[in-house]
């Protein structure tokens, strides 16, 4: 009689169970990773405003008049892709805030806000990002 070679049914079932367990662990981690990668679009949307505020601060000498649509700062941006809005607000002579909001459907309504604050003094701006009030930090997106 010839000996048969191959896998038994129980061995195949064990392999399928192991693969299913690994997939169940990897899937949530992958979903968080993809949301974090998508949130970079929201963070990068602030770049134009950041550069414009720095130029305005050097030109004007304060951040007070560096608001949306003035002194080279772009007007507030509406929805585009995964970004819902970007705006400069709360300007004083030495401080300003850039707030970018991501799509609530993609990132969740409680984790879609990215805030950068500028503190200007002695001819330079020091940025804090993500600043207080950024809900994306709690979700690990920024």
Curated annotation (Swiss-Prot):
Propeptide section residues: 1-6
InterPro entries: N_methyl_site (IPR012902), Pilin (IPR001082), Pilin-like (IPR045584), T4P/T2SS_Core (IPR050470)
Gene3D superfamilies from the UniProt entry: Glycoprotein, Type 4 Pilin
Cystine bridges: none
Domain of life from the UniProt record: Bacteria
N-methylphenylalanine PTM sites in chain numbering: 7
Segments traversing the membrane: 7-27
Main location: membrane
GO terms of biological process kind: cell adhesion; type IV pilus-dependent motility
UniProt entry keywords in alphabetical sequence: Fimbrium biogenesis, Membrane, Methylation, Transmembrane, Transmembrane helix
Location in or out of the cell: Membrane
Gene Ontology CC, one term: membrane
Knockout mutant characteristics: Mutants have no effect on the bacterial adherence to host epithelial and intestinal cell lines.
Family matches, as SUPFAM superfamilies: Pili subunits
Topological type in the membrane: Single-pass membrane protein
UniProt key word Transmembrane helix: yes
Presence of keyword Transmembrane: yes
The protein's role, per its UniProt record: Major component of the type IV (TAP) pilus. Aeromonas hydrophila possesses two distinct families of type IV pili: the bundle-forming pilus (Bfp) and the type IV pilus (Tap).
Similarity remark: Belongs to the N-Me-Phe pilin family.
Name recorded for this polypeptide: Type IV pilus subunit protein TapA
Gene from which the chain derives: tapA
